[in-house]
Amino acid sequence: MEHLEDEDFHVIYYSLEISAELLMAKLLSIYIFEKYHVELSTKDILSRTKGGLLSDEYFHIVEECIPWLRRIESMITIFDGSLNAQTLYSTLVNELAKAGQFVEEEGRKKYIPNNPKQIVVVVIDHMNLLTHTMGRTIKQEIDLASQQLVGLRNMCGISPVAIMQANRDSMSMSRRDMLGSGDCRISDIRDSAGPSQDAEIVIGIYNPFRDKIANYRGYDIKQLQDVFRSITVLKNRYGESEVADCICFYGKIGIFVEPPTPDKIYDYSKFQSPLWTLEPKQDEEDEDDRPKTLNFTL
């Protein structure tokens, strides 16, 4: 979250699954937990729970966060309507033109940013929801969008994050039977392999609880249940691939946290809530159940 307050950092987010309002509420939920150590879900914040309105205490917390929200809104541009490859390209070029210039030198088109230090992250969430037009199949639409992102990445230095879903049904079951694990593979990506071929880094997120796996990499999934996730670097043009790490995911507030290694966990029950991450850190020699943050650079 600290990057969102960096003046050189800007996000262009194509949210095809949820509204801009809900996306901002999700970010606010993370911020409230980090700052106030309170678990408020997006439904709580938007007063969409069965219980009704927020309590006065929580309402005041949300009010105190309004200046932060306004600052974040200036750093994130959200598109939450339907999207096809052509609209993606045109809106992205328009946004980049606000932050720089497209010029032609020696017959080649170049991009000169107003701020050479600026980092522009472009998120498409998710590619499988692109609307296919002009007689193209969904695969052709995804492939075209991916090619356009590569072109703008190479010309403008943007960092595209193309989120895709996996087709897990038959793949995970057969693999689990053979190997005892349903780990993500690039071949699992649904609708098109194009983006994975274009990407410099591919990361897969896997939930073994859905595959009814009792033990995964030493972790007791029966106790961790839906909290547990595995993150695997499936492709990496800059270093090692097929490297995995294990994390806890708390969907209510949208945070990922790395747990201790399984040999240092003696009480699994506390991992059902993210509040364990607020416990005082212990010395390196005695770090049982000690929380760790997990950072990714894309």
What does each model-found stretch correspond to?
Residues 13, 123-124, 158-165:
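Structural recognition of the conserved hydrophobic beta-strand(s) that form the central parallel beta-sheet
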Residues 77-88:
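Functional beta-strand-loop-alpha-helix junction segments that form "active/interaction loops"
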Residues 50-54, 77, 131-143, 174-183:
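Flexible beta-alpha connector loops of hexameric P-loop NTPases
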Residues 6, 33-43, 53, 66-70, ...:
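C-terminal regions of RecA-like/P-loop NTPase motor modules
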Residues 129, 165-172:
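Signature of the SF2 helicase/ATPase Hel1-core->accessory helical subdomain module
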Residues 62-79:
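A short helix-to-beta-strand connector/capping loop
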Residues 1-49, 126-131, 198-200:
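Walker A/P-loop NTP-binding active-site region of P-loop NTPases
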Residues 103-105, 109-132, 136-150:
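Helical hairpin unit composed of two closely spaced alpha helices linked by a short loop
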